[in-house]
Amino acid sequence: MTQQRRLNLVLELVSERGTVSIAEVGDALGVSTATVRRDLNLLAEQRLLTRTHGGASALGSGYELPLQYKIARQSEAKTAIARAVAELVAPGDAVALNGGTTTSEVARVLGSSEALGGGDAPGVTIVTNALNIAFELSVREHVKIVVTGGVPRRQSYELVGPLVASSLRDLSVDLAVLGVDGLSGRFGATTVHEGEAEASRHMAAVARRVVVAADSTKLGRSTFARICALEEVDLLVTDRPAEEAVAAELAAAGVEVVVAPA
């Protein structure tokens, strides 16, 4: 196991449990106590967790991990979701993508799609505020990239601020594919940063259809900043059926659900 993979797993454990001991991390990862101590100290130095006596704790519910530490989480689920989302895209479509690990995977699938890029296919237009998505797709001949204005956030590579809205004002897209940090009946689609929520909200406003791409860990939870009400979401693509209460909320809001098992 590489160090980066191990650090990702440590952060995932801390995020899920809130507080972990050195012994718990060692047992979960199958590594020595000395290795766990080094990893926890390194992550604490990077201000990604708080070191405690005999372990570590999460920084708080409002803290957002940088994108590079999220990539390994639910990776198989995100790949399955991305493939299902890509099936919704027809040649010639315009698609808005916000930032995040799930939408980045959607971008990769669209970028390698033979159905969209083969022969005389008209390709696809991607409108995004995510610098990593724009960079990755810029070499794809069948993809036209439109990047919004804005100020980049280091944690997510997303552009935020009033220039996002002004960039989108005169556009119209077939789909807005949104990655979220939470989806619930009461608060709708949410994310941890208000600037990213605003950018995603503007994307949804210029879309004929709003698609939320989210693994099952995001369902039934809410985070700091609201993107839109649940009723404004047309389709949810996820990896597992929602729990009964959440499924009822989705049905009441008229949200179509596509389950793409990993």
Which residues does each PLM region occupy?
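HTH-adjacent hinge/linker in prokaryotic transcriptional regulators
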Residues: 2-23, 27-101, 107-126, 131-133, ...
